[in-house]
Amino acid sequence: MLYKRNLQLNKNGELIHLLSTEGLPKSILTQVLDTATNFVSIGDREVKKVPLLRGKSVFNLFFENSTRTRTTFEIAAKRLSADVINLDIAKSSAVKGETLLDTIANLSAMAADLFVVRHSESGAPYLIAQHVAPHVHVINAGDGRHAHPTQGLLDMYTIRHYKKDFSNLTVAIVGDVLHSRVARSDIHALTTLGCPEVRVVGPKTIVPGDMAPMGVRVCHTLEEGIKGADVIIMLRLQNERMSGALLPSSQEFFKSFGLTPEKLQLARPDAIVMHPGPINRGVEIDSAVADGTHSVILPQVTFGIAVRMAAMSIVAGNEA
C-alpha cells in the first residue's frame, strides 16, 4: 500500500476511510458485504430512503470522469438521506492552480463530512485522508491504476450472491490487468476472503509475469485462463493509459482474448461473467456473452449502489 498501512482503521480496528481493499481484514470486508445485503431491497421500495446520513454532507470530488461510478455514489448517498454536492472539477479552482490540499481545506470549511474522491494520480485519496479532520471520512472512488475498493467490494458482493462462498472458487480476471485498479482491488479482496485460485489472463504486455507474489496464477492464453473457471471478470483495454504499442490491434486482441460463447464453454457450466464497465463489445467481450444467460453485468450495477451505501454508512458511523 501507499502511506500508512492502517490509515483506513481507527485504534479500535473500525473502518474510518475506505481507500483500498489491500490491508483490510476479512472481518471488515464481510461487514461491508453483510451491511449491503440490508440495503439491496431499498431500490424496490416506494420511498427509497433510510435516514442514516441525514444531516451529513457528502462531496463527490471526481478529478477523473466516470458517469457510472459518480451516479451510483450520488444515488447511494441520497438513499442514505445525505446532502450531496457534486463538484465540476474541470471548472473548479483546481484548474486555476489551487493545490489538492487547499481545495480539501476549503471544502472542509464548508462542513463536509465525507469526501468521495476519484483522481488520476495514485495515492491522492490517501493524501486527503491524512489531512482531514477526525470527523471527516474519505472513500476512494478510483486512484490512478492503484485501487478502486468499492468496485472490488461490489464484485465480491456479486460473486457471493451467486456463488454463496469463496472457498472453492476459481476466478479468472481477463484483459488489461496492468492498468486496472479494479483488478488489484479484486485480487486483494478475493485472496483475503479465501478464494483458492485467482488467475490473471492476457498477453504478456498487459499481464505482467511478476504478479505471482500477489497470490495469483498468471495465464497468457484465454483457454488456459478460463478453463474450469467459476467466475470470469472481463476488463476493458485502457487505451488512455497505454504509452506505446502494447497491443497489435483491438481486432487481434478480440481474436486471442475476446470472450465468445464458444470460448465460454471452457468454463464451468454455471460460470458467471462480470465486467466493471464500460464494456467494449467486440474487443474484450462478444455481445452474445455480455447479454447472455451467464452475464451478471447489470446486477453488478444494482449491487454497487447497496455496497456504496454500506461503505458510506459504516465509515460515517466510526470516529478516528
Swiss-Prot record:
GO cellular component, one term: cytosol
The keyword Lipid biosynthesis appears for this protein: no
Catalysed reactions, semicolon-separated: carbamoyl phosphate + L-aspartate = N-carbamoyl-L-aspartate + phosphate + H(+)
Residues given in the record as L-aspartate binding sites: K96, R181, R236
Coiled coil: none
Disulfide bonds: none
Record-stated family: Belongs to the aspartate/ornithine carbamoyltransferase superfamily. ATCase family.
Known partners and oligomeric status: Heterododecamer (2C3:3R2) of six catalytic PyrB chains organized as two trimers (C3), and six regulatory PyrI chains organized as three dimers (R2).
Function: Catalyzes the condensation of carbamoyl phosphate and aspartate to form carbamoyl aspartate and inorganic phosphate, the committed step in the de novo pyrimidine nucleotide biosynthesis pathway.
Record's protein name: Aspartate carbamoyltransferase catalytic subunit
Lineage, highest ranks first: Bacteria, Pseudomonadati, Pseudomonadota, Betaproteobacteria, Burkholderiales
Record gene name: pyrB
